[in-house]
């Protein structure tokens, strides 16, 4: 089996490499990235004998296609978001299946061409989106009528690492974190579509707190299009409530709302400066040095999914909980493991024909639940499920 990891030197890319080397080792792995300066560090904690580092320009679809054309069985795209479309178009051009962890909206237009070519393109297959969607796809089949589907997920520092004004440290792409603070969201509330524009993301009526076992109160912030997934899962006719939320320690919205109102997240370059810089670019460069984890600090991933409905005429509820902590021995972040391991599992499933559908796929429909959960547990990642049925 030959697998290419695009963006292999990034945080999630390293996690995917760890998985491909240590769990059911893959014979031939290509770590492709624009910058390979960290390769020596990788050799310090990972057996790299089956990994070949290759420099590739993610901004060039031609360069990506040339790499994937080298008898590759499947590729994993963990490049920065602006290069996502390049990776998918290159994979389709050369007929190589590809797994990505980004939202799939930009490449859904490729479905017919990919299906006709017999190529599997799997976006949204990381942590969130990813594990949450696989859980949702399984859960909806446990009801005769589904009425509520809420999904919560967030990466945050353990309590002892909360030593800055926003109680947050970087375990993900910081530019991506900033962009997620200006994302439109769509909910189902009382059976009706409710739009939360990005401008209202941190003041919306949908903001609330949840209690997460072992962590306590967490702030839930609007994050994503819940309506799309109710339609994808075929439950939009019965669902009365649906939402997708990010989780943070309380106080997150109180910090970001005034900054957003004052233009600090704007992408418009400022005039009168020595060079054109947008407020977003300024924050992207300014804040990371203040938000770094120390070697002895853990990041945490917390995920909660809630489902309510009817089975055999009785009320039924399902709650699933997932908690991942950083591995201090390897230094691998919980966020990286949740994203990179999931992508690596799905890539193997495609290469081994456990996933045979083609076109633009989705984890909620196309990743086999039991097999996937078995693979997660092999990696020490456990999903706890609580089921309550009225009258039992």
Please state what every model-predicted region is.
Residues 142-392:
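C-terminal catalytic/substrate-binding lobe primarily of soluble NAD(P)-dependent oxidoreductases
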Residues 90-107:
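ADP-ribose/adenylate-binding Rossmann-like module
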Residues 10, 34-38, 105:
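Helix N-cap at the beta1-alpha1 junction of Rossmann-like dinucleotide-binding domains, i.e.
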Residues 46-60:
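Rossmann-fold cofactor-recognition segment
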């Amino acid at each position: 089996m030959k697998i290419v990891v695009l963006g292999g030197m990034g945080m999630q890319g390293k996690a995917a490499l760890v998985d491909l080397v240590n769990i059911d080792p893959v014979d031939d792995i290509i770590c492709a990235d624009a910058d390979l300066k960290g390769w020596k560090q990788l050799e310090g904690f990972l057996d790299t004998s089956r990994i070949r580092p290759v420099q590739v320009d993610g901004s060039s679809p031609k360069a990506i296609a040339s790499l994937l054309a080298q008898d590759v069985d499947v590729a994993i795209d963990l490049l920065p978001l602006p290069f996502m479309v390049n990776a998918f178009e290159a994979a389709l051009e050369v007929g190589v299946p590809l797994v990505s962890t980004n939202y799939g909206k930009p490449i859904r237009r490729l479905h017919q061409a990919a299906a006709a070519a017999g190529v599997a393109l799997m976006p949204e297959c990381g942590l969130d989106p990813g594990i949450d969607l696989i859980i949702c796809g399984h859960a909806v089949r446990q009801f005769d009528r589904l009425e509520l589907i809420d999904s919560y997920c967030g990466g945050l520092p353990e309590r002892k690492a909360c030593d800055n004004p926003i109680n947050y440290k970087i375990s993900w792409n910081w530019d991506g974190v900033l962009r997620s603070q200006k994302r439109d969201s769509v909910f189902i509330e009382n059976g009706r579509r409710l739009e939360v524009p990005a401008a209202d993301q941190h003041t919306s009526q949908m903001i609330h707190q949840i209690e997460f076992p072992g962590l306590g109160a967490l702030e839930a912030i609007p994050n994503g299009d819940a309506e799309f997934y109710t339609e994808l899962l075929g439950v939009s006719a019965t669902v009365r409530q649906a939402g997708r939320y990010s989780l943070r320690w309380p106080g997150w919205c109180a910090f970001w709302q005034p900054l957003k109102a004052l233009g600090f997240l704007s992408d418009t370059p400022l005039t009168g400066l020595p060079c054109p810089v947008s407020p977003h670019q300024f924050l992207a460069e300014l804040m990371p040095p203040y938000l770094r984890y120390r070697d002895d600090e853990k990041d945490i991933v917390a995920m909660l999914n809630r489902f309510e409905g009817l089975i055999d005429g009785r009320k039924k509820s399902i709650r699933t909980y997932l908690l991942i902590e950083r591995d201090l021995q390897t230094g691998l972040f919980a966020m990286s493991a949740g994203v990179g391991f999931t992508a690596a599992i799905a890539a193997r499933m495609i290469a081994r024909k456990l996933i045979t559908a083609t076109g633009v796929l989705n984890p909620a429909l196309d990743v086999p639940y039991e097999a996937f959960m078995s693979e997660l547990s092999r990696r020490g990642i456990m999903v706890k499920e609580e089921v309550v049925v009225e009258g039992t």
